[in-house]
Amino acid sequence: PARARELPCRDGGTLAEAWRAADLDPDELGTSDWAQQAGAMIELHVEQGRALVDMGHPLAVASAVRPHTRRRATFTGVSDHAGTTLLPFRHDPTIPLAQTIVAARRTVAESGDPHAVATIGRTQLEPGGTNVIAGRATCWLDCRTETDEMLTCVVDAITAASQQAAEAEGCQVSWQRESLTPRTEFDASLTARVQKVLEETIGKTPILSTGAGHD
């Protein structure tokens, strides 16, 4: 709960401050009586991928949440005029950012892990003018793999590719880790019990790891 209260919001402030602004008490986080009394918790969830449809099964039981990290990369170059700064004199941070997006896809595709994924779904260019070469370009990487070891390898490879791309453009890049959740195994006996109940009802039910971090 203490860590959750200090989580930063995109527009500034913390989760605790956002709760107070909504007339909620952040000290109540993690104090649910019923949650403390529960012997086990089972979440029913619509699949957010397409593993089951390809396997031909209507339901599956999750065995674990795959490891997951989010990193922020900041590329720093030189902001200049888009019309008068010729290519040899540019240090455009959007170039290594774009190359990092491509490198992220290539890295997971070549990793050998069929569950490895890397997504850059948010970018920010500053100062953000149409006729201005950006001086700073920031992107956020979401990466998930089957194992903790593979996650480290993939992130290291993407980071190295971004550094190489930044140097080639005469820019700098720095990375910050915003979150890291190791692989989380679910209780094996409970997983087996749920699978048994489902198989007695609907037939064969596979056990799969999941890439949805909230499970």
Language-model features: locations:
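Midchain, well-structured core segments that form catalytic/ion-binding scaffolds
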Residues: 1-149
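Charged catalytic carboxylate motif
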Residues: 96, 157, 193
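Conserved helix-loop functional segments at active or binding sites
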Residues: 103-110, 164, 200, 204
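Short amphipathic alpha-helices in soluble, non-transmembrane regions
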Residues: 153-163
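An extended, acidic, His-containing surface patch that forms the Zn2+-binding/catalytic region
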Residues: 176-215
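Extended hydrophobic-aromatic, low-complexity segments
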Residues: 132, 150-154, 206-208
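Short secondary-structure junction motifs
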Residues: 113-120, 170-172, 203-205
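Conserved short beta-strand edge segments in small beta-sheet-based binding/regulatory domains
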Residues: 167-177
